């Protein structure tokens, strides 16, 4: 009976402990709130969804005269979409499909459902459905290991890591880093099931290489004083993609956000440990973003070398390059866009980084052109295009170059979020489209024959996307000079026909003006 009770706790108590899950005060001090509501730190729109999954906080709020969220208590039916009790009409948005991709399905309704499961909160729901116990505790304070399919996500209690004999080299994701007995817990291990989950073994696709040596220990790591260090705070382990490339690094952040949903915890009173088996550091041009997820500096795994370290609560986060994951090389059904998941991610990060919407002012459409100081994919007639834009009085035009040494990432986000039409050549800088306002349009000036990358990202975020169509009106400097592949369209610079450019920009402007969320809804005849 005890074994069944413990198993039930594992499968149903999905949240990590943290600030937003801290128990309310039993006897409130007169004049003081019964709960630290400031620790929730979520956008106002997200509060009813949070309260839906944290009914204990909703109950306290109802009794507490100091609760700032009382107006949301009438909306507790609102849900993200992955909850089993969630009714479709109360979901946090639902994709829009405009045509049927016959390669996937034959109705618009099924297309919506496919897209929702591929790239929206249905994706988080599928990960929750996959969870199964791999190491079962016998007593309430034993260790445990719970994972999704292919070990893409795992959660562990009382995890033991022995780093006393670790050998590091240049390999960031060494597969045999831990030997038997060096990682594990005091629980009953289902070895056969664990070892059957290795089909997607790959550094940034699965935690199989790291957990295949998980061992059923004959001691209780913490209670038997087998740890040199005990980490009390909930800890997220992450294997990170390239920190110098916004497209790749934000695959890390998006998957961390999805992981928070799977855990039902958005607390920042957590540690994040970068799982890196090398002795190298990590170059991170977007480190300000971590402030949306943790109150502390990111910890390198090597910090714990030569020690036995025990983690009371540990999560192995969803990874940035998972097969059928989000959002690197994700095969998406065509004809659908607008995921609540990516809109919520954008709102979450902007809110926690204190990036606010400051306009538009006087109804003018704010156009931002992203210039490039790199060797390739420059706009050769950029000044000519800008001068043409400035002839339209309703456009407010600025040129930016997001050089990290000259413009900090938070300042970059402020510019992006206060842009209505974002224009740039194919490149990682277009990942900024994640933080455009809902009514905005992104204009990938030329996609360099990589057609899906930023089109799909715009579809996920739900902002309008356009790109250059007429090949006879774009003029490459030459055929391109890839260092090993020879001719390549990404390795040259381009000029553009001014009239065609203006036609496309005005199309984007028309979309902005017609968008239901555009703050100035009256049409501008000047355009």
UniProtKB/Swiss-Prot annotation:
<keyword id="KW-0325">Glycoprotein</keyword>
<dbReference type="Pfam" id="PF04577">
    <property type="entry name" value="Glyco_transf_61"/>
</dbReference>
<keyword id="KW-0808">Transferase</keyword>
<protein>
    <recommendedName>
        <fullName>EGF domain-specific O-linked N-acetylglucosamine transferase</fullName>
        <ecNumber>2.4.1.255</ecNumber>
    </recommendedName>
</protein>
<comment type="similarity">
    <text>Belongs to the glycosyltransferase 61 family.</text>
</comment>
<keyword id="KW-0328">Glycosyltransferase</keyword>
<feature type="short sequence motif" description="Prevents secretion from ER">
    <location>
        <begin position="524"/>
        <end position="527"/>
    </location>
</feature>
<dbReference type="InterPro" id="IPR007657">
    <property type="entry name" value="Glycosyltransferase_61"/>
</dbReference>
<feature type="signal peptide">
    <location>
        <begin position="1"/>
        <end position="17"/>
    </location>
</feature>
<feature type="glycosylation site" description="N-linked (GlcNAc...) asparagine">
    <location>
        <position position="354"/>
    </location>
</feature>
<dbReference type="GO" id="GO:0097363">
    <property type="term" value="F:protein O-acetylglucosaminyltransferase activity"/>
</dbReference>
<comment type="function">
    <text>Catalyzes the transfer of a single N-acetylglucosamine from UDP-GlcNAc to a serine or threonine residue in extracellular proteins resulting in their modification with a beta-linked N-acetylglucosamine (O-GlcNAc). Specifically glycosylates the Thr residue located between the fifth and sixth conserved cysteines of folded EGF-like domains.</text>
</comment>
<keyword id="KW-0732">Signal</keyword>
<keyword id="KW-0256">Endoplasmic reticulum</keyword>
<dbReference type="GO" id="GO:0005788">
    <property type="term" value="C:endoplasmic reticulum lumen"/>
</dbReference>
<feature type="short sequence motif" description="Required for optimal activity">
    <location>
        <begin position="295"/>
        <end position="297"/>
    </location>
</feature>
<dbReference type="GO" id="GO:0097370">
    <property type="term" value="P:protein O-GlcNAcylation via threonine"/>
</dbReference>
<dbReference type="InterPro" id="IPR049625">
    <property type="entry name" value="Glyco_transf_61_cat"/>
</dbReference>
<dbReference type="GO" id="GO:0006493">
    <property type="term" value="P:protein O-linked glycosylation"/>
</dbReference>
